[in-house]
Amino acid sequence: MDKNKEGKKVFDGGVTEADVEKWKGQHRKVFRIDVADGDELHVGYFHRPSLQLMAAAAKVAKSDEVKSGETLFDGCFLGGSEEMRQDSVLFLSAMQELNKAVGAKASSLKNL
C-alpha cells in the first residue's frame, strides 16, 4: 500500500498506468474518482456509461434510487478500491462525483 504526498494510505486496487492506457483505448473517456476517508484515500477508475446502461439505471431509479446508483457504479467501474463499492459512505461520495461526470455537457443549438 502506498502513501500519497499528504501521508494518506492510498487504496487503488493496484491499478497501473498501463491499465489506465488500456482502458482509454477501450472506452475513450476514463476518469478517476478519489474519496478521502480520514487517513485513507480510496481511488476508483470509471468510464462513461453506454446509453443502454443509462436507460437501465433510469428505469430502476423510478422505484429505487440507491439501486439505480449501484447499477451505474457497477456498469462504469473499471478498477480501484473495492471498498468504494462496499462501504456506504465511500459509495455515496463516489456516486456524487460519478453523477457529475456523466451529467449533461455544454451544448448549443443554432438555427441555420
Regions found by a protein language model. Name each.
Residues 35-112:
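Short, surface-exposed, charged amphipathic helix/loop patches that serve as local interaction elements
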Residues 1-51, 112:
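Short, charged/polar N-terminal "headpieces" of proteins
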